[in-house]
Regions:
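Short amphipathic alpha-helices and their capping/turn segments at secondary-structure boundaries
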Residues: 1, 99-110
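Short, acidic/turn-prone active-site loops that include or flank metal/cofactor-
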Residues: 71, 91-95, 119-120
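Short acidic/histidine-rich active-site segments
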Residues: 111-133
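Short, conserved active-site loop motifs that form the nucleotide-linked donor/cofactor pocket
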Residues: 2, 85, 111-113
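Mid-to-C-terminal alpha-helical segments outside catalytic/metal-binding sites
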Residues: 135-169
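Divalent metal-binding pocket/active-site signature
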Residues: 1-83, 103, 126-135, 150-153, ...
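Active-site glycine- and acidic-residue-rich loops that bind
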Residues: 88-103
Length: 169
């Protein structure tokens, strides 16, 4: 059973593929997710404005949005809130130079939070630089719980409930 479309979106960081092709593909994936009434898992790198404009233009009641491995700005997160987007934190939030991202996640409503590993990349501290693995998600959960002033066990329940609401409701 298909439960989501993605990871898809826009990545203008390396300029490895034509922007227009990326945009067309992203729009097609949004249409498919809406038609199937399943979430779209969105990757956005160096493309906040374009990603937001496309999501806003294509937003409808059947479109459920998950911002995968979210590293966007606080203003980008704020723009996405009316679209009822979910935001997934990766190991990046544990990095000491991620203060802006930590601040952003501290303000995202609990009911819109998820956590992920993005294995084999982006290992959280204390495993930064090593190949990421699923067991390392506990460090991301601990950091996000700290940022949200919650017990880690409560954060895990919240993010599990959010996952189920997003993908199975």
């Amino acid at each position: 059973k298909i439960i989501g479309v993605g990871e898809t979106g826009l990545d203008f960081y390396y300029n490895n593929s034509d922007k227009d092709v990326q945009i067309e593909s992203f729009q097609n994936h949004i249409e498919a997710a809406s038609t199937l009434k399943i979430p779209i898992i969105v990757h956005s790198r160096s493309a906040e404005n374009e990603t937001y404009e496309i999501l806003k233009k294509n937003y409808n009641k059947d479109l459920k949005i998950l911002m995968h491995c979210f590293t966007g700005s606080s203003s980008f997160a704020t723009q996405l809130m009316p679209l009822e987007a979910y935001f997934s934190a990766s190991g990046i939030i544990t990095f000491k130079n991620s203060l802006d991202l930590q601040e952003t996640f501290s303000k995202i409503p609990n009911e819109k939070l998820l956590i992920e590993t993005d294995s084999p990349f982006l290992s959280p501290v204390p495993n930064r630089g090593k190949k990421n693995e699923p067991s390392f998600i506990k460090f991301t959960a601990e950091k996000l719980a700290q940022l949200k002033n919650m017990k880690t066990s409560d954060l895990i329940k919240v993010t599990t409930d959010n996952f189920n609401n997003l993908f199975f409701n």
